[in-house]
């Protein structure tokens, strides 16, 4: 397994677009998304670790299964473990400005973001 903490991202701009509930076959119907897909890195075989958004997104940000990161059930949805470092925290440590544009701030772990809105 490759650790993000050991990587040099100094020449990279990173934009992560996560659209909850978007079927991948619909990307071709949207010219903007189609262009982004064709001109950048696109992960075509992603499989969700959870059937609901909160656990799935917290797993994306932590790199851990819901049972490991603490967001493993509807009743534990806001108990993201404090000792887990998110990839946004790692990017911030590497000098990145990190920003999230989300409908609900509860959807993602806020740690490591300079701005959430």
PLM features: what roles do these ranges have?
Residues 64-117:
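Catalytic-site neighborhoods of secreted/periplasmic enzymes
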């Amino acid at each position: 397994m490759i650790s993000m903490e050991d990587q040099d991202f100094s020449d990279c701009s990173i934009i992560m677009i996560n659209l909850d509930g978007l079927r991948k076959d619909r990307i071709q119907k949207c010219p903007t998304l189609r262009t982004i897909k064709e001109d950048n890195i696109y992960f075509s075989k992603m499989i969700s670790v959870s059937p609901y958004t909160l656990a799935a997104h917290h797993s994306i940000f932590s790199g851990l299964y819901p049972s490991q990161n603490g967001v493993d059930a509807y009743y534990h949805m806001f108990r993201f473990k404090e000792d887990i470092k998110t990839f946004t925290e790692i990017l911030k440590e590497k000098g990145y400005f990190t920003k999230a544009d989300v409908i609900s701030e509860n959807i993602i772990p806020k740690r490591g973001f300079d701005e959430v809105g």
